[in-house]
UniProtKB/Swiss-Prot annotation:
Database matches in CDD domains: homeodomain
Name the UniProt record assigns to this protein: Homeobox protein HD-1
Keyword entries, A-Z: DNA-binding, Homeobox, Nucleus
SMART domains: HOX
Primary gene name: HD-1
Cross-referenced Gene3D superfamilies: Homeodomain-like
Amino acid sequence: MSKLPALVSLRMNEIRGIYIETNNRVVEEMDAVIDEFAKDVGSSPDISTNVRTYLEERIRYIREFVVDHIGFSISEFRTLYNPNGNESIKSRRFPKFITEALERSFEIDQYPSEAEKARLAKICKLSTKQINNWFTNKRNRTKGHEGGRQY
């Protein structure tokens, strides 16, 4: 009976992974269909930039919501079976999609404006303090790798 929580948690993580893989495959298939359409017709369908941006943001939000909800369910389940907190189970890393968004922004500007930080916080569903900390830590980590060793 004591193996049940670990088994259920493992299965929930597998479901989360399958969802992410399926989502990525669907996005790739959509891109392939658009490319094929563009080859056959000669161009992509005309969609205004605002509509395209809105749709992309909504799709991203839905994907993130599902992944976050699965992650929350996993955490909630683990908390139920680990009420004393004896075992450290909290991940200290952001999910991959958040890290990728922050990395892309970092490549553009290592010192983003407050507006950009607020935008990232909204997209990633993090606080601006978490965004600030991530950029500070990232700058500190990359600073050590740029010039090689100094003696």
